[in-house]
From Swiss-Prot:
Subcellular location: Cell inner membrane
Protein function: Essential inner membrane component of the type IV pilus (T4P) that plays a role in surface and host cell adhesion, colonization, biofilm maturation, virulence, and twitching, a form of surface-associated motility facilitated by cycles of extension, adhesion, and retraction of T4P fibers. Controls both pilus assembly and disassembly and plays an important role in PilB localization to the complex and ATPase activity.
Upper classification of the organism: Bacteria, Pseudomonadati, Pseudomonadota, Gammaproteobacteria, Pseudomonadales
Keywords: Cell inner membrane, Cell membrane, Fimbrium biogenesis, Membrane, Protein transport, Transmembrane, Transmembrane helix, Transport
Effect of residue 182 to I: In strain: PAK
A single cellular component GO annotation: plasma membrane
The species this protein was found in: Pseudomonas aeruginosa (strain ATCC 15692 / DSM 22644 / CIP 104116 / JCM 14847 / LMG 12228 / 1C / PRS 101 / PAO1)
Gene that this polypeptide is encoded by: pilC
Impact when changing residue 189 to M: In strain: PAK
Domain of life assignment: Bacteria
Keyword Ligase recorded: no
Protein name: Type IV pilus assembly protein PilC
Pfam families: T2SSF
Length: 374
């Protein structure tokens, strides 16, 4: 009844009001970065339409199926309604809104251009999350191929090869070397399959813990990834795009270049670029031009350096950096699509070699027996 009364005050006469149920499937859903990007885009849209801030929270919150996201929006609304600024309200949720995000919102509130800043932040979040998704896709695809190949091979070795093995024992002859190797591998997996699974799990767990706890391990991994064929190029272009996109967004918001570089450092997602940005910050703080400093790092591509130089000379640095980001985002997109196209026949080839090799190994003794009988 309170909801009906509230709506009537706004000139809306509802015929029926019912409580929206919570899906059991969505009850435990986490708040994802794309949820935050959507929230930001909707906030920018609402403010552009002249909807009051507190009312915007109500409308946006109801639009999310994820109950945890609705709860987050409601908590932000409560903070703002109690007198806190939007930026300070967001700072109380650091697990969802990083320092860069909050600083940009703060700049928008201070300058009276919150709508424009939210629009820029929304674009930034959408672009960066899209880029991350493409990188995950590029990395996941070959891993999926390897896993499928291993599972198929394991099933054949554990379930199919033993059927042939009983036949081979009746031959009373020495098996071909290739067949004997496959039989030995089959016997090993039949006896030790559980230990193999535990071992693989232990390796995965150790890798995860090292990545979480050891900075040296993470640094080494980041440097190694950049040197990988195909994947290294995708990660490199992604880091350049994230660098340019972050710096363009912060600089356009009126953040001083040296301060903007603080935000850029962690946004690239790779230690090689993080170290390069730290050096650039030191150089720029002493008066060196951004493009000169980028060149001295030997990390950034010439195109990005030249576009930065043009931006500095013409006074349109944010615009030029945005063009650099868009170019490398498209490059990543094309590279991932090409990789996917390349991997499809590779999957068939790998599976064909594995399955075909096992079949040949099983039939070699039969062919030899046929030759002897002939």
């Amino acid at each position: 009844m309170l909801v009906k009364a509230h709506l009537r005050k706004q000139g809306i006469n509802p015929l029926k009001v019912r409580k929206k149920g919570i899906s059991l499937l969505g009850a435990g859903k986490k708040v994802k970065p794309m949820d935050i990007a959507l929230f930001t885009r909707q906030m920018a849209t609402m403010m552009g339409a002249g909807v009051p801030l507190l009312q915007s929270f109500d409308i946006i919150g109801e639009g999310f199926d994820n109950p945890n996201m609705r709860k987050l929006v409601d908590e932000i609304k409560q903070e703002v309604s109690s007198g806190n600024s939007l930026a300070n309200s967001l700072r109380k949720k650091p697990q969802y809104f990083d320092e860069l995000y909050c600083n940009l919102v703060d700049a928008g509130e201070q300058s009276g251009a919150l709508e424009n800043l939210l629009d820029r932040v929304a674009t930034y979040k959408e672009k960066t999350e899209s880029l991350k998704a493409k990188i995950r896709k590029a990395m996941t695809y070959p891993i999926a191929v390897i896993i499928v190949a291993l599972i198929v091979s394991a099933i054949l070795l554990i379930k199919v090869v033993p059927q042939f093995q009983s036949v081979f024992q009746g031959f009373g002859a020495e098996l071909p070397a290739f067949t004997q190797m496959v039989v030995n591998l089959s016997e090993f997996l039949q006896e030790w399959w559980l230990a193999v699974i535990v071992g693989v799990g232990a390796i995965g767990f150790t890798f995860k813990e090292l990545h979480k706890r050891s900075k040296k391990f993470r640094d080494t991994l980041d440097r190694t990834i950049l040197k990988l064929p195909i994947f290294g190029g995708i990660v490199y272009k992604s880091a350049v795009a994230r660098y340019a996109r972050t710096l363009s967004t912060t600089f356009a918001a009126g953040v001083p270049l040296v301060d903007a570089l603080d935000s850029v450092s962690g946004a690239t997602g790779n230690i090689v670029f993080k170290n390069a940005v730290s050096k650039i910050k030191q150089d720029v703080s002493t008066g060196m031009q951004l493009n000169f400093s980028m060149r001295t790092t030997s990390v950034f591509p010439n195109m990005a350096i030249q576009m930065t130089a043009i931006g500095e000379e013409s006074g349109s640095l944010d615009e030029m950096l945005s063009k650099v980001a868009s170019y490398y985002e498209e490059e990543v997109d094309n590279a991932v699509d090409n990789l996917t196209t390349l991997m499809e026949p590779m999957i068939m080839a790998v599976l064909g070699v594995l399955v075909g090799g096992l079949i040949v190994a099983m039939y070699l003794p039969i062919f030899q027996l046929g030759n002897v009988v002939g």
